[in-house]
From Swiss-Prot:
Enzyme Commission number(s) from the entry: 3.5.1.5
Catalytic activity annotation: urea + 2 H2O + H(+) = hydrogencarbonate + 2 NH4(+)
Lineage: superkingdom: Bacteria
Biological pathway: Nitrogen metabolism; urea degradation; CO(2) and NH(3) from urea (urease route): step 1/1
Record keywords: Cytoplasm, Hydrolase
CDD domains given in the database record: Urease_gamma
PANTHER family: UREASE
Name of this chain's protein: Urease subunit gamma
Length: 100
């Protein structure tokens, strides 16, 4: 299978988010990469589902709380940016203050 660097990166993000969602379900606090992967995948999947850019940003900013992450992780993530494919094309999604 031939994958582009972007496809490899997306695959890694989705793999990490799968692990992160399972850890979150077990009640474990998430570290930085796990938190970013969950926020990113939430945005990517929202776009894929046909949601608007505004709805995707809102949903991705509500997927995690400070109680879900290790101490200090929320402060390390002022925003998350990902290029997502919407029904009308590709757009940059910026989620500001994603962990509240």
């Amino acid at each position: 299978m031939q994958l582009t660097p972007r496809e490899v990166e997306k695959l890694m993000i989705y793999t990490l988010s799968d692990v992160a969602f399972k850890r979150k379900a077990r009640g474990l606090k998430l570290n930085y990469p796990e938190a970013v992967s969950i926020i990113t995948v939430t945005a990517l999947e929202g776009a894929r589902d046909g949601k608007s850019l505004e709805d995707v940003m809102k949903e991705a900013s509500k997927v995690l709380t400070k109680d879900d992450v290790m101490e200090g992780v929320a402060d390390l993530i002022p925003n998350v940016q990902v290029e997502a494919i919407f029904t009308d094309g590709s757009r940059l999604v910026t989620v500001h203050d994603p962990i509240k």
